[in-house]
Amino acid sequence: MKNLQSKNNKSKNYELFLRKSAHIKSRQWWQKYLFKIRRLLYRYLPNQKLSLFKNASFTLLITDNKEIQDLNKRFRKQDSPTDVLSFPLIKNEQQNKRYLGDIVISHQKAKHQATNEKKSIEHELLLLFIHGYLHLLGYDHKTQKQEKLMFSLQNKILEKINVRN
């Protein structure tokens, strides 16, 4: 893939891809917060979700509106850019390890939303990552009950990270 910086970090159970056009935060910045978020998820997830989380890996792609719109159209039949997409996958029985799936974030959408909501880009990027990760763990917001549960956990983790708002 052209214009892509990748880092496979097996010890941290993730693969991080930053499009050069979307490189608004450094790899080190992402690594620091991915570690913190996963640690907080481990602390706050209910027991039935912890089994999904242990020994699990994922891929994170930070890209632009064009690419996320293409993905949104292809997989969700919606021809518009979105802020975050999650693609949950299933357990790999042979490796006794779970690959949770992929999270794709549009840096342009994140920047636009941060500006509109008068929040920092850092806050918005981490909010989108947490939101996408919770989808990989099976959380959703199709009903009010689901939304309350998911957003409560999302906000608790975001608050504990203590990123500039």
Where are these regions (language model features)?
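An acidic/histidine-cluster motif and surrounding catalytic segment
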Residues: M1-L126, L136-N165
